């Protein structure tokens, strides 16, 4: 458990899983404690206990949502999202939120954006 204090406190919220992903309530005859506090970029402390509270925190965090949007864009288009404009992440995130977090809608929006605002390729 000490490694999570050094690396990342979020790991404590996953302590109920062993090294190969099996669920456990005890380790070495001691109850597993999955409680942790995480400091956000804004400096707020968030209390987490277990994987469900971690998942809820991540799903509701706008930074995590924007990272998802950026990673999906770059995976699909194979280009850095910044090449499509400095507001592209924010614009796609706003669309994602407005669509009630529809991944299908986000994929369509990314494809439409990339096809209409693509990077010009050099002529060979």
Locate predicted features.
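Active-site substrate-binding loop specific to GH73 endo-beta-N-acetylglucosaminidase modules
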Residues: 1-74, 86-103, 107-124
């Amino acid at each position: 458990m000490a490694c999570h204090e050094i690396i990342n406190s979020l790991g404590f919220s996953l302590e109920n899983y062993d090294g190969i992903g099996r669920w456990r309530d005890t380790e070495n005859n001691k109850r597993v404690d999955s409680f942790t506090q995480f400091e956000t970029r804004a400096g707020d402390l968030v209390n987490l206990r277990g994987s469900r509270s971690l998942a809820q925190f991540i799903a509701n965090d706008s930074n995590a949502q924007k990272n998802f949007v950026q990673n999906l864009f770059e995976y699909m288009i194979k280009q850095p999202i910044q090449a499509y404009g400095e507001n592209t992440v924010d614009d796609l995130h706003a669309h994602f939120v407005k669509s009630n977090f529809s991944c299908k809608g986000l994929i369509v929006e990314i494809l439409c954006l990339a096809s209409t605002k693509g990077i010009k390729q050099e002529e060979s």
